[in-house]
Design a protein with these regions (language model features):
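Divalent metal-cofactor coordination and adjacent catalytic microenvironments
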Residues: 1-196, 204-287
Length: 287
């Protein structure tokens, strides 16, 4: 089993300006370093939790479809069926396609009606529809690929002239979908007005190419009065507060302690166990 990120995240869950506010940094001399530390903290958080923070598109490659073992009727019951495909990155947003090489070597795409996706699982599972089995794939490495989108949020920009938002990421929404927003800027930062990160909104229209209009829960159109405070700071979807708080603490520690070792100094290291505990509610494991 191997994975390839086809469309990487279009940004980071926390913005450089939020880190600077948290660290009381008033100039831009270290912006480049802070940006790299944010990326490192995000990668560490994703490694620890097996979560995808910002939306990305992944391709899982298998040598064959999973099948029941020959002793399956007598095997110990398991919460995960032996014939299930397990998607390593969570939370799952959408299975884009399942493709395989048939016995003639031709690439085939499965009909979504032939399989069931359990996105509520962490990690998500895919099994054949009841009464069906996985197709027979060519017995060679990499014969099966599953393309899927995972993550919590994507950055967006606002066009105040036509009242549209443009989302930068692989995930799409349908008319009527309920969405929430958050901003990365720390105290004083505001989403593009009149959006409120404590409220939910509806997708009113989806012309295409990541462009949408919004309405409130009563169906009233959202008319934007400003475009927000810079790009990469407003997100559709919400990355959990605990993960973002952990990232801020991790970036702060790496920024203040720039060396791997301290030479010639008496150093007392005090562990703060609650810090990594911020990630505990979000940790997942692969069977």
């Amino acid at each position: 089993m191997s994975e390839l990120c086809l469309i990487p995240p279009a940004g980071e869950p926390i913005h450089v300006e939020e880190v600077k506010l948290d660290r009381r940094i008033i100039d831009s001399a270290d912006d480049g370093r802070i940006r790299s530390l944010v990326a490192a903290a995000r990668q560490h958080a994703e490694m620890q939790t097996r979560l995808q923070l910002l939306h990305a598109r992944w391709q899982l490659t298998l040598d064959a479809f999973p099948m029941y073992g020959c002793l399956a009727p007598f095997a110990r019951p398991s919460k995960i069926p032996e014939h299930a495909i397990i998607l390593p990155h969570s939370p799952l947003v959408k299975v884009v396609s399942i493709q395989y090489l048939d016995m003639s070597g031709a690439l085939q795409t499965m009909d979504p009606a032939d399989y069931v996706v359990k996105a509520s699982n962490t990690p998500a599972l895919i099994t054949p529809q009841f009464g069906k089995i996985w197709p027979i794939a060519l017995p060679e490495i990499g014969a099966v690929t599953v393309t899927y989108d995972a993550g919590y949020a994507s950055p967006f920009t606002v066009n105040t002239t036509n009242g549209q938002i443009t989302v930068n990421g692989p995930v799409t929404w349908n008319v009527g979908d309920r969405v929430q927003f958050y901003g990365s800027g720390g105290e004083g930062y505001k989403l593009p007005a009149p959006l409120d990160q404590d409220a939910s909104y509806l997708i009113a229209s989806a012309p295409g190419n990541g462009v949408y209009t919004l309405s409130d829960q009563a169906g009233n159109a959202i008319a934007f009065t400003d475009a927000g405070q810079g790009t990469g700071r407003a997100f559709i979807g919400v990355v959990p507060d605990g993960i973002r708080s952990w990232m801020l603490l991790r970036v702060g520690a790496m920024y203040e302690n720039r060396e791997e070792v301290a030479v010639g100094q008496r150093v007392v290291v005090l562990d703060l166990p609650y810090v990594d505990g911020l990630l505990d509610p979000f940790r997942t494991s692969l069977p």
